[in-house]
């Protein structure tokens, strides 16, 4: 059962054109189908079926139906699409009347498919693009992209070769210029330091001469600068001891003063507290005094009233 099914899958039947008595022939084993050819064949079969339905409807109505001027046909299938089916499958439909050259040419579908795509565009300008045009477009774009990439790579190689040769020369020139500038600055600094050293040596010589003259004058007057220096050293030692003793005594006195000041501050704070208490007591006493005065005045008024009543 598997062999007839395989044969049925491999055979292809005619969908358009007048019926013939010849039986359908299977594909030769040497024929090969590319992916875009299988997709184009499927789309062409769909268009052929639509064209057959359209032709049957037109035959029953007695002629071709004229579509409205602003309406596009729902099924983009015409006799041109049926013709493309015959061109796309020449080895499976010998009744179309095509020669053997077209069958051998069907293996390389690229130019034929491009012509068919142009015809379909001309017939159906508003419809979607078929798969064949998409495949051809993608291949053309890929070829253009590859050609552009190769050209850009060649241009880059040609431009990089002289640039790489010139780069180290320019870098060396820049480095040499920098080194020359640094050398000039160093030479200037050396000359300046040499001049400063000469000035300093001259000043040192003058100071030594002045020192010798001063010592000679002191010796001529009978003064020994060495003894004077010892005496001057001993005098500050005595002064230093005296000042240290004074400082110690002052520190002791300051400590005593601080202690007494703390005690006095504590006493002052205690006195302030006592004063506050006494002020509060005086305020209370005054309040009590006023109350007593008020009560006394009330009592005097009551006594006067009682005397008046007694007199009555």
From Swiss-Prot:
Compositionally biased residues, Basic and acidic residues: 131-143
Lineage of source species: Eukaryota, Metazoa, Chordata, Craniata, Vertebrata
Disordered: annotated span: 1-171
Keyword Hydrolase attributed: no
Annotated keywords: Cell cycle, Cell division, Centromere, Chromosome, Coiled coil, Cytoplasm, Cytoskeleton, Kinetochore, Microtubule, Mitosis, Nucleus
Complex formation: Part of an astrin (SPAG5)-kinastrin (SKAP) complex containing KNSTRN, SPAG5, PLK1, DYNLL1 and SGO2A. Interacts with SPAG5. Directly binds to microtubules, although at relatively low affinity. Interacts with CENPE; this interaction greatly favors microtubule-binding. Interacts with DSN1/MIS13; leading to localization to kinetochores. Interacts with MAPRE1/EB1; leading to localization to the microtubule plus ends. Interacts with PRPF19. Interacts with DYNLL1. Interacts with MAP4.
Coiled-coil residues: 166-210, 246-287
Source species, domain of life: Eukaryota
Locations listed in the record: Nucleus; Chromosome, Centromere, Kinetochore; Cytoplasm, Cytoskeleton, Spindle pole; Cytoplasm, Cytoskeleton, Microtubule organizing center
An example Gene Ontology CC term for this record: ruffle
Protein name: Small kinetochore-associated protein
MF terms in GO: microtubule plus-end binding; protein homodimerization activity
Record remark on domains: The coiled coil regions mediate binding to kinetochores.
UniProt GO BP: cell division; cell migration; cellular response to epidermal growth factor stimulus; chromosome segregation; mitotic sister chromatid segregation; regulation of attachment of spindle microtubules to kinetochore; spindle organization
């Amino acid at each position: 059962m598997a062999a007839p099914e395989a044969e049925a899958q491999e055979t292809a039947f005619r969908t358009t054109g007048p019926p013939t008595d010849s039986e359908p022939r299977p594909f030769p084993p040497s024929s090969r189908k590319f992916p875009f050819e299988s997709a184009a064949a499927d789309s062409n079969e769909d268009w052929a079926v639509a064209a057959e339905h359209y032709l049957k409807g037109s035959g029953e109505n007695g002629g071709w139906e004229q579509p409205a001027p602003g309406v596009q046909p729902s099924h983009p299938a015409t006799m041109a699409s049926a013709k493309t089916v015959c061109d796309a499958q020449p080895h499976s439909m010998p009744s179309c009347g095509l020669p053997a050259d077209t069958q051998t040419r069907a293996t390389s579908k690229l130019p034929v498919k491009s012509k068919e795509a142009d015809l379909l565009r001309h017939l159906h300008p508003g419809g979607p693009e078929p798969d064949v045009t998409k495949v051809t477009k993608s291949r053309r774009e890929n070829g253009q992209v590859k050609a552009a990439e190769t050209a850009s790579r060649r241009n880059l190689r040609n431009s990089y070769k002289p640039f790489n040769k010139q780069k180290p020369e320019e870098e060396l020139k820049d480095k040499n210029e920098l080194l020359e500038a640094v050398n000039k600055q160093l030479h200037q600094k050396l000359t300046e330091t040499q001049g400063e050293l000469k000035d300093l040596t001259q000043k040192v010589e003058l100071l030594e001469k002045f020192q010798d003259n001063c010592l000679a004058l002191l010796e001529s007057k009978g003064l020994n600068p060495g003894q004077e220096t010892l005496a001057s050293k001993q005098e500050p030692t005595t002064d230093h001891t005296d000042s240290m003793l004074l400082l110690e005594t002052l520190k002791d006195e300051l400590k005593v003063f601080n202690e007494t000041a703390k005690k006095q501050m504590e006493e002052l704070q205690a006195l302030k507290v006592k004063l506050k208490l006494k002020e509060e007591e005086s305020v209370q006493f005054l309040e009590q005094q006023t109350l007593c005065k008020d009560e006394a005045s009330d009592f005097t008024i009551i006594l006067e009233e009682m005397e008046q009543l007694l007199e009555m």
